[in-house]
Amino acid sequence: MGQPGFTPPGFLALTIIEKQTPDLTIPCLKTPERSILYGDTSSKRDPRTYLNNVFSLYDYFRKEFYAPKEGQKRAKPEVPLVINTPGWVKGNGYDALVEMLRYIAPTHMVQVRISTESKNLPAGVFWLEEDQELSVSLIEIASARRDAYNRSVTIRKDASLIRDLKIFAYFRQCFPSDFSVDTFKELAQALIAHRPYVVPISKIKVKHLHCQVKHFERAETLLVVYMSTDVFVLVPSSEIFYALNGSIVGLAVSSAKNSDSEHATPWCVGLAIVRGIDVSKGIFYVLTPVPLSILEKVDLFLQGLLQIPTRLLQVPGCLSPYMSTNVLLQS
């Protein structure tokens, strides 16, 4: 979710791989079969929602690729499911991983282990109950990197840069493949010049993924409560759009929920940058590579904690459109 394989950061996604990816060292994006926007790069803020999203994706996979359809005597040929588990494996992260593995019940488990034993997960089928017996193939791989004493070492990657590159690759899709956009500077300039889509404000509802927004009766004030913290903020209703402007939002169709729960987050069809808001005309201006035919069905913006990379806000000779003071227009 922090550095997912085939989507921008913040997503939990089910992606169908039909051919080998030639080079995993560069960002490779694929349109997922189904995706849910968690809206953050770590599950620490809300592990329960994270797990529910994982379970929804897994249930969808079982239903679509294993269960027989109406009129079929047996299910489709089995499609293998490879799960990239989270890297947070201490404390609550470990508990979440155990719950995930018990729900999914994998047939194979691959662990990459290093010489610092305290950083490894327990050996064996650590997630099973004591009286539970399941046939699981365990595969352990030693780290390929070793020091002068033949001890495995970890190579720290710049996670922030990897996330920025994924966002770069995603919004690069706003332009034709033969369009010359190879650097953050070029993409920033191209996005500034790109004509945005117009989306009526009246059509859109906003779902805040990691805070609760409540309206006070007889008052033009909103109470914003940040989940998993004790922080709350009072925001005038007239200024609530400032939280959306210049942000990355998920695009969703409210009727396309991933479960029957009224609190379930609908499937996400893509991301957009809110380029500007004209309050007097009731219009959002958004930049997105999502096709117009899909965008026309969108009636829900999902606001998480994803940030526009700083490199896309810095264009020499231009005032960043996402940080201007006059982007909210009122009559």
Give short role names for the model-derived ranges.
Residues 41-46, 110-331:
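Preference for solvent-exposed, low-hydrophobicity sequence contexts
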